[in-house]
């Protein structure tokens, strides 16, 4: 993961690696902090695909980018799968790029982005979390989605968010969705434990970053 600076405000960080938490939220580490911050290499949950390097061997093991994850959370999905298989994602602060945030959708909050990101958030959970992990996180997930619904309702995008959630459930239980679901394996049980601890810890990190 590179240190991504905001195209229009290069003195501010746009992302220093990505995190994902038990609320079902993905967020950019270090967003809006000064460029000088986050200067140490460290492990992160995933890399923003806007500027990242991936080993070919990892894709050969976990599978490629999922075309069903078009536009949003596709990099979190790759990072999640990598974690399941025991790989680690690292932040490299010496790699600096300028990033035009929301370049595909045109703005931070709009119907296109809200619809796709909410859809993909459901699909992400379905694909990567075993049933037991979903149940373990269910109270946090319900809270996280309730907060998002209220947030987008205030912005006049509540209906679009709910519509996207419906699309996410339909995608998850469609033939294409089931085809891409990560199959649970006991040999990865320890990795799931590590992931779960990260999901809980990242809820607190969300308050800081």
Residue ranges and their predicted role:
Residues 1-26:
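Conserved donor NDP-sugar-binding/catalytic core segment of glycosyltransferases
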